[in-house]
Regions:
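Small-molecule kinase domains that catalyze NTP-dependent phosphoryl transfer to phosphate-bearing small molecules
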Residues: 130-137, 211, 218-259
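Conserved phosphate-donor/acceptor-positioning beta-strand/loop module used by diverse small-molecule
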Residues: 191-210
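Metallocofactor- and cofactor-centric catalytic cores in central/energy metabolism, strongly enriched
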Residues: 38-57, 63-67
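N-terminal accessory targeting/assembly segments
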Residues: 1-21, 25
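Ser/Thr/Gly-rich flexible loops in soluble cytosolic domains mediating phosphotransfer, phosphorylation
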Residues: 81-125, 226-232, 239
């Protein structure tokens, strides 16, 4: 039986960065039984003392932290060592290395990444655009989109679009269904836009569609989930993507993050041509 670990995520900001890092870290270990506790906006020694006190009472405690203020980072490290609690700073060495490389002193300011700068407003604008141009809506605004996603039903168009929007890309997605034709402007200017086709394994699509149909009773279950019919849908979409020279991504075994990363790479290559 595997031991259970108590993982403490301690951050001087929202903790979002640390949580993402931990998710990536834990995915590398198949047999990792843990209970996670998160502490955000930790900016005093008193807060750290309270966390260390709790950690030291439990077996198998581990602290991961992102604290950019040098004095406080040293304090949590010292107190953890004193109480024999394994403690790992995520940003410390990285900030130091960058400081040396750039030949400038780091500001060591918590939440510096959350300053309302141009990038922030760009993301907000992208999110608003993407939400109002989901599932084939307002295709007349296609010239305003950074990225256009095409695909048959349940190929992760919407979640991928939202993820891209959070990265600052105005994304418009269009479902490839019989009663929804793609805009003529795409066909006439197929190389002008950054269009990406999403495809998936028909059997996997059938499973996902069955789940959706069980929630939405108005859907024709047989027509919507028939594997042979889906094979035709996917094959037709592939032919269209090939006809217009649009890059295709198979999302069957990809997470939304992986799909989005590939899309961003395609976008950057096209932009820099």
């Amino acid at each position: 039986m595997n031991e259970k670990y108590n993982v403490y995520l301690v951050s001087d900001s929202t903790g979002e960065t640390l949580d993402r890092i931990f998710l990536s870290l834990k995915s590398q270990f198949a047999n990792f039984d843990y209970e996670k506790k998160e502490y955000a906006f930790v900016r005093t020694e008193q807060q750290i003392d309270k966390i260390i006190k709790e950690c030291s009472k439990l077996q198998n405690s581990i602290i991961l932290y992102t604290i950019v203020e040098t004095k406080l980072a040293k304090y949590i490290s010292k107190q953890s060592e004193k109480n024999k609690v394994p403690c790992f700073g995520i940003l410390g060495n990285l900030i130091l290395s960058f400081s040396k490389l750039l030949n400038q002193k780091a500001i060591h300011k918590p939440s510096a990444q959350h300053v309302l700068d141009d990038d922030y407003y760009k993301r907000i604008e992208a999110i608003q655009f993407t939400m109002s141009h989901d599932d084939g809506k307002k295709t007349e605004d296609i010239n305003q989109a950074d990225i256009i996603l095409l695909g048959v039903s349940r190929t992760s168009k919407t979640p991928t679009s939202i993820y891209l929007a959070n990265r600052g890309y105005k994304t418009l997605n269009i479902p490839l269904v019989l009663d929804h034709k793609i805009p003529q402007i795409l066909k006439e200017n197929f190389s002008k836009f950054c269009v990406i086709g999403l495809v998936a394994d028909p059997e996997r699509l059938s499973e996902i569609r069955r789940t959706r149909a069980s929630v939405n009773q108005s859907i024709d279950l047989k027509a919507y989930t028939d594997v042979e019919a889906i094979k035709v849908e996917v094959e037709n979409s592939k032919k269209m993507f090939k006809q217009y020279g649009w890059p295709t991504i198979d999302v069957t075994r990809r997470s939304v993050e992986e799909t989005a990363a590939s899309i961003i790479k395609i976008f950057e290559i096209k932009k820099n041509k």
